[in-house]
Every structure is written in structure tokens, then in C-alpha cells.
Design a protein with these regions (language model features):
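Cys/His-rich short segments
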Residues: 160-184
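N-terminal alpha-helical interaction blocks
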Residues: 5-162
Length: 184
């Protein structure tokens, strides 16, 4: 229903194109199996994070293998080119030109500590300072869906631990992700 509402809007935004893009990303993201990162979840750390309201990743960063991460990005990029809805030659050429080797190991390490900061740094490393908005949207989809591979199990485990806590309150307190701290 919400999508139908957006499609009817006349605000100059290509909502149909954005919906098609998002759907094509969903179609290809499952080409990457969810990673079972060794030792990525610790119940004691989770309980400490929840109790102290500190993001889990602050206490125990997720260890991501940089070479594997770059391969995952390339695999998803290739699948997106093959199956995605981007079909304008200039945009396909830009997508093919992305070089994941520009991502430093330190930046990939940052993905396991602070995914929001990682996105900002990674975008600049891969696209440079003069990145156009279309490519920023494309790279966001690629980066976020590869991160999903690494964070999905951890996020589910944290949600399970959070469900055990009986501190339900209502009010105007800001919500943050218990795993990474991003605003919810």
C-alpha cells in the first residue's frame, strides 16, 4: 500500500525507478549466503551492551576478512549488472568501473566497528570526492547488502537477547540499534 502511494506522487522523484532498483537489489542480494563469522556473538557482551546501553560493536567489533569482503562486493556487483534494472550504458559502465580494491583494510575493519562511519569512508574511497548521487545510491545498496551478510546473524542474536530484557517503557527516548548504535 505504501509503495502504491509513492507511485502516485507527483513530486519529480522517479518512485517507480527507485522501487524497481530496490527490488532488483533484493533479487540479487541473496546470492551471498549469510556469513557465519566465528565468534561474532557473545552472550555476556550482549547483556553488558544492553544493560549499559552501549552498542555491541563498541564492546566487541565484528572481525571481517578484507579479501573475502571485497570478493563479496564484486560478486554482488556482477550479479547486479547481470540481473539488475540498470540498463543505461553510461550507468552500467560506471558500475563496472567500481574498484573494490580501493577499500583499505582499515576501512573494512571499520565496517565491523561502526557501519555508519564505514559507509561514509568507503564511499569516498571507492567513488572519490566527486561522486554523483546516482552512484552513491548504487554503492549504498551494494555496501549495505554485503554488510547484511555479516551482520544478519549478529543482529538476530542481539534482538533475541534484547527480547529477554524486561525494561519496557514508553516515552520520547531516542532509539538506537543495540548492535551498531545507529538511530533506529
Amino acid at each position: 500500500a505504501a509503495i502504491a502511494g509513492y507511485l502516485k506522487r507527483d513530486d519529480g522523484i522517479d518512485w517507480k525507478g527507485l522501487t524497481d532498483y530496490a527490488n532488483s537489489m533484493y533479487d540479487v542480494r541473496d546470492e551471498l549466503e549469510v556469513a557465519d563469522v566465528e565468534g561474532n556473538f557473545d552472550i555476556e557482551t550482549a547483556q553488558k551492551a544492553i544493560k549499559s546501553k552501549i552498542p555491541y560493536l563498541t564492546l566487541r567489533p565484528l572481525q571481517i576478512n578484507p579479501a573475502e569482503f571485497r570478493k563479496d562486493l564484486q560478486k554482488l556487483q556482477d550479479a547486479f549488472i547481470e540481473k539488475g534494472v540498470i540498463n543505461v550504458d553510461e550507468q552500467v559502465a560506471k558500475l563496472k568501473a567500481l574498484d573494490w580494491n580501493k577499500l583499505t583494510d582499515a576501512t573494512i575493519k571499520l565496517a565491523g566497528e561502526d557501519p555508519t562511519a564505514f559507509y561514509e569512508v568507503a564511499t569516498k574511497e571507492v567513488l572519490g570526492e566527486e561522486a554523483d548521487e546516482d552512484m552513491m545510491a548504487v554503492i549504498a545498496g551494494l555496501l549495505l547488502n554485503v554488510l547484511r551478510r555479516y551482520f544478519r546473524n549478529l543482529g538476530e542474536d542481539m534482538t533475541h537477547e534484547l527480547s529477554k530484557v524486561d525494561e519496557s517503557k514508553s516515552g520520547d527516548a531516542p532509539l538506537g540499534c543495540p548492535t551498531c548504535g545507529a538511530p533506529a
